[in-house]
Amino acid sequence: LRLLQRDPTDLGLTALLDAHRRPQPRLVLGRLALSAGVRCGMDVSDGLVGDLQKICAASGLAAEVRLSDIPVPALVREAFPEGWAELGLAGGEDYELLLVAPGEVLAAVAERSDVPLTTIGVIGAGLPGRVTVRDARGNTLNLERMGWDHLDGRA
């Protein structure tokens, strides 16, 4: 939505708008991940942190994410210098996959995939459903928005 509110020629944002208007779901990657042994994953259409919270709550686990490892396109960082982190963490409509598996399973997926995979954090014991996001200095970020919630209609 924030992209649609801007001049699309501004900073060459047309490629990002095209990706928003014509999403390419990662169906092949999903099948590849399943065949490699990934047993937990979902799309990130409702926001990375919000969707990761759903996975953690359903699994009885917690997650820690490193902001610096989240692959936010340079164009988004340029267009939204003060808000790119929130967009990357809670923006949604990315239609990328969030996969949860042991490192060796994800490495096997990465070897066979044309889509680059990025490890953004770890999942383990902790308060079920809690997602902690840390900046480059290790400080915890406090997010006002976690993502879209279809049940209450709020982001």
Place the predicted regions along the sequence by residue.
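Short, acidic (Asp/Glu-rich) active-site segment that either coordinates a divalent metal cofactor
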Residues: 1-31
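Glycine-/charge-enriched secondary-structure boundary and capping motifs
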Residues: 12-15, 35-155
